[in-house]
Amino acid sequence: MIEIENVSFYYQGNEQMGAVNHLSLSIPKGQVVVLCGESGCGKTTVTRLMNGLIPNFYKGDLTGAVRVNGRDITKMPLYEIAENTGSVFQNPRSQFFNVDTDSELSFACENLGYPKDEIVARVRETVKDFKIERLLGKSLFHLSGGEKQMIACASVCVTAPDVMILDEPSSNLDVRHISILAKIIQKWKAQGKTVIISEHRLYYLTHIADRFVCLAKGKKVFDLSADELRKQDMEKLSALGLRTPDIRCLEPEPAGAAGKQSLCFEKFRFSYKRQKECLQLENFCVPKNEIIAIIGNNGAAKSTFGRCLCGIEKAGMMRDGDMTLLYKERLKQCYMVMQDVNHQLFTESVMDELLISMKNPDEQQALEILAQLGLSEYAKRHPMSLSGGEKQRVAIATALASDREYVVMDEPTSGLDYKHMKEVALCLKQLKELGKSVFVITHDVELIYHCCTYVVHIEAGKVINQYAIDKSTHTLLRDYFLLQ
């Protein structure tokens, strides 16, 4: 039993950041509860209250009571919380203690003093459940974002805690691993574990979760069962920042005629040090000035293709009409929003991030871009003080400010609610209207339906399918996301 009784919390040094206001919530043992709501509504703060990170790590002004099995969590020793509660953070990289997957999977058991034979058995069973055998023996630095997310989920599962707290666990997962995650959550539920999931993607949880608790500005808006959620008006849910509970209802937006010009990629072959070739694209073309969705499973080399396209990795050539662009030219004309935006935010304020991205810094134009993405109030904030979804939008704002000809966005809607996903979709459409070619590496089917016009499907470093999105092909796209 987890009880949150009239709790309010404000982070130290920032009274507006992730505040929870007079929140009361009771979660009986064995329930699966989804915390939902728009970015910055307080979901992550609630998870930190439940796992003791507040106030042990995140300091601030806390009132009210948080109890786990009748005990005040603020008075429980950390080792006891760690034994009973497993947490997966919004950014899995921030919870890794090792440099390789095997050590990370066994670390929690070693830390709790389990015998070696038991550790080996627990890791083996967890690896089998998560179907991550191919990730064993690998460097964490060489994994894709989705692969890191699976290792993070598996590493906390190894100790079999009674309470599992997951913060955006599907944000970087492909459709296959979302299905695996859903089955694991079902298994936890059958075992009587209490599972709390902070999530924007709701469709994979509607047949598992007991309750959906929606927050807005740190307060509870509703507490509904899955059946009650499905009966809600979609416009009402969208206004609260919620994604669709049923992706079968999605329809593509009417697409205009594709342009006659093409972008062609030749000899895009690449391998990381001491590894076999992961990208093997000999020759393929896509229409120019379109929004192109790059889809495929985690580890398919989608991000590697994006890095090669931008010239970050030295591979192949791109032809745009009569122009041949080698990697040095592509570095000048391409802009990439990385999968982990923490790698590319390094100034003292959000405004400065946009200004250094511009050829000719223009504060008024920067303010207009921030307003377009709902970031005006954060102009003077330090980027690292923002939530994961807010950082994501700042990185997208820098892409708009850069005015480059070719834009690559790697999981641009990771951790974003419905409202902000739509804002990103509008920005991508704006880039298209300005004559830019946009490549979107994504697992977000809702984003694809809102703005993308063409699909390139990559698996094992090769293009296995490509097509324009229209009424004749949208079932092909939808079935890929439903049937994996």
Question: Which role fits each region the language model picked out?
Answer:
Residues 153-154, 396:
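Hydrophobic anchor residue at the start of the ABC signature
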Residues 59-71, 314-331:
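Conserved ABC transporter NBD signature motif
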Residues 219-241, 462-483:
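Conserved beta-strand-loop-alpha-helix hinge in the C-terminal portion
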Residues 118-135, 363-378:
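Conserved ABC ATPase "signature" region
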Residues 139-143, 147, 382-386, 390:
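Conserved ABC ATPase signature
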Residues 164-167, 407-410:
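Catalytic Walker B motif of ABC-type/P-loop ATPase nucleotide-binding domains
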Residues 199-200, 442-443:
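H-loop/switch region of ABC-family ATPase nucleotide-binding domains
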